[in-house]
Amino acid sequence: YRADMWKHFTAEMPELAKIPVVGTVGDKTFNAEQVVALNPDVIFIPVDLKDQYESDAKAKMDAAGIQTIYIDYHAEKLESHQKSIEAIGKALGKEERAAEISKFYTDRVTRVLDRVSKINKPKPTVYLEVGMNGPEEFGNSFSSNYSWGALATMAGADVITKDVIKKTSPINPEFILEKNPDIIMIMGS
């Protein structure tokens, strides 16, 4: 899925290449039997994939005694991030470290949101796209309440795809030309 990143990570840390590939829930390559064979104590699943995971694999995890914890980072809500950090810390026996991370993160987000709230000028219109497919193919854009779109909205942007995308999806190039956004951001993944 992110072969370019994997190539760089494994170049720096070759031992990563020894980690078994178990697939992903989102593209239905998740291999529950392989996960069970690895005998983990816990599995973390993005809350966005809860329905698919529960229909495809959760019963197998439950039968094997593997705890499932749902985490939520894509809605970009501070409270969801705090709860996810806390749940991960608790599951790993690192509650103190999780509390430190949550406090650091909360302080930084609060600082940015406070500054944004003091800006008194029109919001720039913004188009966001994950351009990991290269220039030949349009990547996913985001609604104003999901992932990069939610972050841009919190930072004071008016995301042009807010009314046409529910979460994330490629957008018709004509739409972008028609909206003529003030800012176009093409990001990596």
Protein language model regions, located:
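A short, structured surface patch at a secondary-structure boundary
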Residues: 1-37, 42-50
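Alpha-helical, coiled-coil/dimerization segments enriched in small aliphatic residues
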Residues: 26, 140-167
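Residue-level detector of structured alpha->beta connecting loops
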Residues: 39, 65, 156, 180-181
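Alpha-helical segments flanking ligand/cofactor-binding loops in enzyme cores
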Residues: 33-36, 59, 174
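Short coil/turn segments
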Residues: 2, 47-50, 73-76, 144-145
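Ligand-binding pocket segment of bilobal, Venus flytrap-like solute-binding proteins
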Residues: 148-151, 168-189
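Extracytoplasmic substrate-binding proteins
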Residues: 53, 57-136, 158-161, 170
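Structural recognition of the beta-strand scaffold that forms the well-ordered cores
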Residues: 1, 42-46, 68-71, 124-130, ...
